[in-house]
């Protein structure tokens, strides 16, 4: 029972459910608030373009080979992520370098080697034992190697679009050749004597190209394209389940043929429908039609003879059945009687079996009773003899007591 001192307090809602209210928001709504934007000048605001970042780091991967970020207790530093100024391809990508990428990689490595040699040469002190390859000689060799790379003048050979065209060297050379041919067409022909004097300054800038045509390669590529086309057609037929109609005369002989053979067969069949050959086809069809009519007549005659023979056999069978149908009721009656006789014999056999079983049970019980009777008679004889002995002993005692 409630305490009576709280009965008449103001603000109490009677006959209503209890409600407990707090000034705080629920836990799910407490984290939902608008973060105040920082407007301080000390904070640097960096605008990040996700598309540009994606384009920059697309097809890149982080090399996790030989990395160790664990704590160290020795003075040697652990190996973490390494970053460089320029990298063509990462290790383990399995992608072959293009000529442009290989050229830029070699040029960059030569520049790094030059910087390292210059740094070593500036910081090297005189030592008692000099190495066979001094920094000065190494710097000369690096400069010669760089000059050799620059002498390849790939950009001069392939034009200003080498960075783009070197991904496809054959296409770049073909475009360059077409450009020089157009330039040669528009250039005026020199005089006849100038060609005999020797190569002029203009001829030094020309590049000689040799074009080699391989018919076998063209045939092989064409056959490969046809095989690829047949493969795609087979996959398409398997996808749509295009089954050939064996009854269609246009598809006869096309099973298992390649595409070219199929086209040739269809072309030969189309050529047969020429106007010049339609008369011959019509004459052949008329002769075939006459032969078909003769065959139909002979077939009808043969079918009529077969029908007559079958009807004659059926009539003979009916005649035989008439003589057998007279005796059929008697046979049925005899079978019914025989069925009843078999049922009675089966019942009699069951009764005999039951009687034999009962007789065996009675004989067994008689044997048991005979044995029990013999045992009872034997026990009675023994008991009778014992009683007689007891009576004789009692008579003797009585006689002794009477004396």
UniProtKB/Swiss-Prot annotation:
Primary residence: cytoplasm
Composition bias, Basic and acidic residues: 184-194
InterPro entries in alphabetical order: Dynamitin
An example Gene Ontology CC term for this record: membrane
A Pfam family reported for this protein in Swiss-Prot or TrEMBL: Dynamitin
Compartments, record wording: Cytoplasm, Cytoskeleton, Microtubule organizing center, Centrosome; Membrane; Cytoplasm, Cytoskeleton
The entry's keywords: Coiled coil, Cytoplasm, Cytoskeleton, Dynein, Membrane, Microtubule
GO BP, sorted A to Z: mitotic spindle organization
Annotated stretches, region: Disordered: 1-26, 183-206
Membrane topology annotation: Peripheral membrane protein
Coiled coil (residue ranges): 99-132, 381-401
Superkingdom assignment: Eukaryota
Record's function text: Part of the dynactin complex that activates the molecular motor dynein for ultra-processive transport along microtubules. In the dynactin soulder domain, binds the ACTR1A filament and acts as a molecular ruler to determine the length. Modulates cytoplasmic dynein binding to an organelle, and plays a role in prometaphase chromosome alignment and spindle organization during mitosis. Involved in anchoring microtubules to centrosomes.
Family statement: Belongs to the dynactin subunit 2 family.
Complexes and interactors: Subunit of dynactin, a multiprotein complex part of a tripartite complex with dynein and a adapter, such as BICDL1, BICD2 or HOOK3. The dynactin complex is built around ACTR1A/ACTB filament and consists of an actin-related filament composed of a shoulder domain, a pointed end and a barbed end. Its length is defined by its flexible shoulder domain. The soulder is composed of 2 DCTN1 subunits, 4 DCTN2 and 2 DCTN3.
Stated name of the protein: Dynactin subunit 2-B
The encoding gene: dctn2-b
């Amino acid at each position: 029972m409630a305490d009576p001192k709280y009965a008449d307090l103001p603000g109490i809602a009677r006959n209503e459910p209890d409600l407990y209210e707090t000034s705080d928001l629920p836990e799910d709504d407490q984290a939902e608030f608008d973060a105040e934007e920082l407007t301080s000048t000390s904070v640097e605001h960096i605008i990040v373009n996700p598309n540009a970042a994606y384009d920059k780091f697309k097809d890149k991967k982080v090399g996790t080979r030989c990395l160790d970020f664990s704590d160290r207790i020795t003075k040697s530093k652990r190996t973490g992520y390494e970053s460089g100024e320029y990298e063509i391809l990462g290790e383990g990508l399995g992608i072959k370098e293009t000529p442009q990428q290989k050229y830029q990689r070699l040029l960059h490595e030569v520049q790094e080697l030059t910087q390292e040699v210059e740094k070593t040469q500036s910081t090297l002190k005189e030592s008692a034992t000099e190495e066979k390859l001094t920094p000065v000689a190494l710097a000369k060799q690096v400069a010669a190697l760089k000059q050799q790379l620059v002498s390849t003048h790939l950009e001069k050979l392939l034009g200003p679009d080498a960075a783009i065209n070197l991904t496809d060297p054959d296409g770049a050379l073909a475009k360059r050749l077409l450009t020089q041919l157009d330039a040669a067409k528009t250039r005026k022909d020199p005089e006849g004597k100038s060609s005999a004097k020797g190569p002029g300054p203009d001829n030094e800038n020309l590049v000689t190209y040799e074009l080699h045509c391989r018919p076998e390669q063209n045939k092989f590529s064409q056959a490969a394209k046809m095989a690829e086309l047949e493969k795609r057609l087979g996959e398409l037929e398997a996808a749509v389940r295009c089954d050939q109609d064996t009854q269609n005369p246009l598809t006869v002989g096309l099973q298992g043929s390649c595409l070219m053979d199929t086209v040739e067969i269809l072309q030969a069949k189309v050529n047969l429908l020429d106007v010049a050959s339609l008369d011959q086809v019509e004459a052949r069809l008329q002769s075939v039609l006459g032969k078909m009519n003769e065959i139909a007549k002979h077939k009808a005659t043969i079918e009529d003879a077969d029908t007559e023979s079958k009807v004659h056999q059926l009539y003979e069978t009916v005649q035989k059945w008439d003589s057998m149908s007279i005796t059929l009721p008697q046979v049925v009656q005899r079978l019914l009687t025989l069925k009843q006789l078999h049922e009675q014999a089966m019942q009699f056999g069951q009764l005999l079996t039951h009687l034999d079983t009962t007789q065996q049970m009675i004989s067994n019980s008689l044997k048991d009773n005979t044995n029990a009777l013999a045992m009872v008679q034997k026990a009675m004889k023994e008991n009778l003899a014992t009683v007689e002995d007891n009576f004789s002993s009692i008579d003797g005692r009585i006689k002794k007591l009477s004396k």
